[in-house]
Amino acid sequence: MTSALEKNRPGAAFAFDNSYAGLPQRFFAPQAPTPVAEPWLIKLNEPLAEELGLDVEVLRRDGAAIFSGNLVPEGALPLAMAYAGHQFGGFSPVLGDGRAILLGEVVGRNGKRYDIQLKGAGQTPFSRRGDGRAALGPVLREYIISEAMFALGIPATRALAAVTTGEPVYREEVLPGAVFTRVAASHIRVGTFQFFAARGDAEGVRALADYVIDRHYPELKEAENPYAALFEAVSERQAALIARWLHIGFIHGVMNTDNMTVSGETIDFGPCAFMDIYNPSTVFSSIDHHGRYAYANQPAIGQWNLARLGETLLPLIDADQDSAVDKANAVIRAYGERFQAHWLKGMRAKIGLEGEEDGDLELVQALLALMQAQGADFTLTFRRLSDLAGDDAAEPGFATSFREPDSSGEWLARWRGRLSRDPQTAAGRAAAMRSVNPVFIPRNHRVEQAIEAAVESADFSLFEALLKVLAKPYEDQPSFAAYMEPPKPNERVLQTFCGT
């Protein structure tokens, strides 16, 4: 029981249990946040705070000071993490946290360890020429997308809080400053391994690998070859994650190796977006000039990133280099099969199939080709198909998803024939489909509207409304029906920006 006196201690909301700070100091740079002028708490994620075992009462009182960096909580060991990375294929040997500061780690009520990190908390030794700050728009975007991904069931970092700083930040224009508090299973990236490998720091790579196994994959400690098993486990999680991205039409936008976690969580939502009209070549990010990270390219980029991780682990996988390369290549080749298995399993679920038949892949591909040819909305097409799967399957919306409504007839006939051989009941199938086909996603135009109102008018009502809708993405919410609709032509977001 926390006494009233203890609650009144500044920053007593956290019970930090820091492990990364115990690694050799070349892994990070100690760095306190830089205080800001007038912090104001926009949003505190109280359910998440409770899951993390934090004192919500203290956070309500001191949250503006803590989450802005003005008050460093007791037990925190603030630091900026070192890492490298391939950015759009080009290697940068030193990147690191240029505007993010890890306050420390807490152990949640589920017994799992989590990082608490402030983004936009000031300059660090890795800032290069940056100011270490964040603008309000990108902070709100990351809050919205993080929590939407959680509600959709996609592994991702979480949003604990957002604050304004009362200070301007200078980009192409002057914008209000803000700080985002991110929660992650960890912030260890492929680029973290690359940082040490690029320096020939074999002991650094080994220490990091041991730490990752201990923190994220403790079951591998007894494996015959723990480091080869680690590479395989990371590959499995990444294949599953990217398959889930494709199932919901998510486009990360900047899949650099410094933006790929070894924990299997989605991280860094700067230019990310959700596809409206289905087109596998869709790109939103303003800096992805050649479509490297387009929707359909994401699985292959995941494999490319894993190859970069494998390169760093070769000396640990086997002392004989040729043998190490063979073992790593086997994992990289298997990634494609892993991804395809996860993707097809999820797509079967999206069209209501419980059993497996050889023709299922072609049936899925035929639907996607029809959607592309007919300019169909990705999210609503699958949701409306769910409405056709039940006993009361008279819902006409599916056909209207297509420019030529009659164009869907042939595919629907094939689909119904396939359903007739599937073991599920109609009611069970419809319920299962609705549990994997969302009705609400963070539509890009809705996200931009919420950001614009907050930045230009200090009006956070659209931000709050969007969070409320997206908290239940698989449920029909008649009072928020407008949020399910695709953008009108004049509302379409054609480009997204990193915002850093």
Swiss-Prot record:
Reaction(s) catalysed (UniProt annotation) = L-seryl-[protein] + ATP = 3-O-(5'-adenylyl)-L-seryl-[protein] + diphosphate; L-threonyl-[protein] + ATP = 3-O-(5'-adenylyl)-L-threonyl-[protein] + diphosphate; L-tyrosyl-[protein] + ATP = O-(5'-adenylyl)-L-tyrosyl-[protein] + diphosphate; L-histidyl-[protein] + UTP = N(tele)-(5'-uridylyl)-L-histidyl-[protein] + diphosphate
Q: Which InterPro entries match?
A: SelO
Instruction: Supply the alphabetized keyword list.
Output: ATP-binding, Magnesium, Manganese, Metal-binding, Nucleotide-binding, Nucleotidyltransferase, Transferase
As recorded in UniProt, its EC number(s) are 2.7.7.-, 2.7.7.108
Q: Which residues bind ATP?
A: 96, 98-99, 119, 131-132, 182, 189, 268
Which Pfam family name is an example for this entry?
Answer: SelO
Quick check: keyword Nucleotide-binding in the entry? yes
Required co-factor(s) are:
Mg(2+); Mn(2+)
Name any one GO molecular function: AMPylase activity
Kindly list the positions annotated as binding Mg(2+).
259, 268
Active site per UniProt: 258 (proton acceptor)
Role noted for this protein? Nucleotidyltransferase involved in the post-translational modification of proteins. It can catalyze the addition of adenosine monophosphate (AMP) or uridine monophosphate (UMP) to a protein, resulting in modifications known as AMPylation and UMPylation.
Instruction: Give the UniProt family note.
Output: Belongs to the SELO family.
Q: What is this protein called?
A: Protein nucleotidyltransferase YdiU
Name its species.
Rhizobium etli (strain ATCC 51251 / DSM 11541 / JCM 21823 / NBRC 15573 / CFN 42)
What lineage is on file? Bacteria, Pseudomonadati, Pseudomonadota, Alphaproteobacteria, Hyphomicrobiales
Encoding gene, per UniProt annotation: ydiU
